Structures are given as C-alpha cells and as structure tokens.
Amino acid sequence: MTTQFSVADIELSLSRYPANQVSNLQAWDAADEHLIKHLKEIEQKADNTAVINDSFGALCAALTAQAADWPIWVETDAKTSQLGTLQNFNANRLSDSNLTWLNSRELPPQGINLVLMKLPKNLNYFIHQLQRLSQSLAPNTPVYIGAKAKSINKALLETIAKHLGPASASLAWKKTRVITCIADGKPRALPSEVSWAVKEFNLSISNLSNVFAANKLDIGARIMLDNLPEGHFDTIVDLGCGNGILGLRAKQCYPNAEVHFVDDSEMAITSARQNWQANKLDNPEQAKPQGHFHWDDCLTHLGDEVKPDLVLCNPPFHQGEAITDHIAWQMFLDAFHQLRPGGMLQVVGNRHLGYHVKLKRIFKNCETAASNGKFVILRAIKSAKEPVKPAKDVNEPDHQS
C-alpha cells in the first residue's frame, strides 16, 4: 500500500501506526484528500484550527506542511492516532510544536475559527462531538466534515443542523463529499452518560459515547464472564478493557488482586475508572489502590515492573474503518512479553478469526476453555522455558482491508 500522500501540491510520506505492522493499509483516505483540496480551493489561510478524528495525522501534517506555525488543536480518542500523528510528523521532519492535544471529553478553547473533522463510525460519538463544539464555537465558524459519499444523507445533515448548525454537502469527488456546517453559536447540553446494571454480578456500568457495547453486555464479554479461570491471581490485566467489565468481575473473583485496565480509547479508560469507583472495588484491607488505568497502545508503556499472572483479552478486529488482525497480534505478543512465567492469557473471539493458530505460534500451546456456536475462549500459558520475547518472524499478521 502506498505511503505517498500527494494532494494540492502537498507531498508527504504517511504510515499507519505502528508502521511496521500495517504496511498494506493506508494511513489516510480520499476524504482526507478532499478536505485538503477544499481548503486549497477556498484559499484558507493559517488560523486557529481544531482537527477532529484525524486517524494518523494526515490532516495535521498537511496543514503544518503549508505553514509550520499553523495553530492546531487536535482532538482524538485513540492513543494510536496520537502516536501515529507524531510518528508521521517525525518521518516528514515536521515540528509538532504547533499541535495542542485534546481528549474527546475536553472542550476546544474559545477562539477556534476553523474546524476540520472526519465522520466517525459511531453516530452517538459524532453527536457528542457536535454538541461539545456547539458549546465553544462562535457563530458563523465554518466546520468542514469529510466522509464517504455513501455515508451522507438527508438524515445526517439534519442531525448536524440539530446539534451544531445548518449543513450542506459538496459534490462528490473520489466517492467522498465535504459537508459544510456553519455553527449557529447556540450551546447544546451534553447527554447524560448511559448507565445499566449487570444484576447477576451486582455491578453498575456506565459508558461514555465512544465505548463499545453502549447499554448491554456484548456476547463475547458474556461468555468470558461465565468462564473466568479458577485459581489465585495477584496481578491481572484487562487488555482492551472497554468499560472495564472483565476487570471489574475479575476483582470480585480475586479480591486481593491488583487490576490494570488498558485501552486505546481514552473514553474507555475513563469509563473503566468511573465504574471501578462506582462499584467500590478497592479492597479496604489493602493499603493502596488496586485499580490502575492506562490509555495506551496495547501494553507498550506498561513497564517491566508489572508482571501479571493473568491477562484477559477481548480483541477488536477493526481500526477505524479498516478490518485488520494486527491489533490482536500485538495484544498477544505484548501479553506474552508482559506475563510472568506460568502466567495465563485468556482470550475470547469469534471462531472464524482463528486466534488459536496465532496463540500456538507465540506461546507454543493453546487450549479451548469454552465455546458456543459463535465464540470460543482460549487459554495460553507462558512457559518458564520460553524466551521473554518471541522471534520477530512470529509477528506476521494476516491483514484484510
């Protein structure tokens, strides 16, 4: 897949993150190109700009390539988006000193005069973003939203008008359109968080808008919760934790354990932390907090001092619009590296994904702990005889696009 981004006299080399694992998937799409092309056509000058949902920094890099001091506030929920943007700035020898990072719960500052945005897959998340923009944008601020033409319809334009201001769509170009919204300056109230009960485990769960399974247990989590391993565990990692349901239940089952919640989504980590606190899962007999929360790319920055004896994992197989198994590969490899000898990785996944093959390549063992018609639970044990890191040629994901 090409890494050469070329549009409107801007030439960049862009890779997804991590670059060495997703070489057959492109770091941008035609909607990114359309947004930059549109700015060139209207002769947009450098101004205080919010860039939202920029997957791997294509928009930020294109603006910075035009003007090194272009002031950009970058809003992302994904840690890999932040890391990918910085990776691409470095690869193109661009300074990132013009970038100010915001998470998806923070309001952009007053004085933003331009917004560039990619349409996310999650409509509830998109509405949340529009409502937050309505609280900070001055009247008549232009908001340009890039999306696939097939994703844009009358209902979407009405949704944008309802939550931010009147909107219209451009002509199609490379099967994409640019929506122009003019902020009306009327602040909208943010919706309340979704809360629901898992009565059989006496847990109360709340989700922020970009967290998977907004108001009920997903099927994979359900079978995982019913099949947690027997035994005693001191340090547990809920890898790809979402709202934290697996780690919360693990703390109930292993009350003396410390639990580390890890996710690429900042909203997921915030939801997991809120759920830990709401369910009062810290053991009062232990002197220090037992819940730890990490917004991270898998276990990249967890630290060698954390050596879990159990990792629970419900891997995603999407990254944005792309279907890919590289995230599962990285999760399995990171778990292998992080686990103490004799530690267990327990994974739930769709049968057709073939995770047992990957786990056997990495751990040299894998057993089926439970299954139903659609899902399978797999367990792999890190042998004391295995090296701390597997050979590099193990890391050979089979990509799809």
Swiss-Prot record:
InterPro entries: DNA_methylase_N6_adenine_CS, rRNA_m2G-MeTrfase_RlmG, RsmC/RlmG, SAM-dependent_MTases_sf, Small_mtfrase_dom. GO terms for cellular component: cytoplasm. Gene3D superfamilies: Vaccinia Virus protein VP39 (3.40.50.150). Its main location: cytoplasm. It is an enzyme of class 2 (transferase). Keywords: Cytoplasm, Methyltransferase, rRNA processing, S-adenosyl-L-methionine, Transferase. The keyword Methyltransferase applies. One of its GO terms (molecular function) is nucleic acid binding. Pfam families: MTS. Its EC number is 2.1.1.174. SUPFAM superfamilies: S-adenosyl-L-methionine-dependent methyltransferases. It catalyses: guanosine(1835) in 23S rRNA + S-adenosyl-L-methionine = N(2)-methylguanosine(1835) in 23S rRNA + S-adenosyl-L-homocysteine + H(+). It is found in: Cytoplasm. Belongs to the methyltransferase superfamily. RlmG family. Specifically methylates the guanine in position 1835 (m2G1835) of 23S rRNA. PANTHER family: RIBOSOMAL RNA LARGE SUBUNIT METHYLTRANSFERASE G, RIBOSOMAL RNA SMALL SUBUNIT METHYLTRANSFERASE C. This is Ribosomal RNA large subunit methyltransferase G. It comes from Shewanella loihica (strain ATCC BAA-1088 / PV-4). The lineage of its organism: Bacteria, Pseudomonadati, Pseudomonadota, Gammaproteobacteria, Alteromonadales.
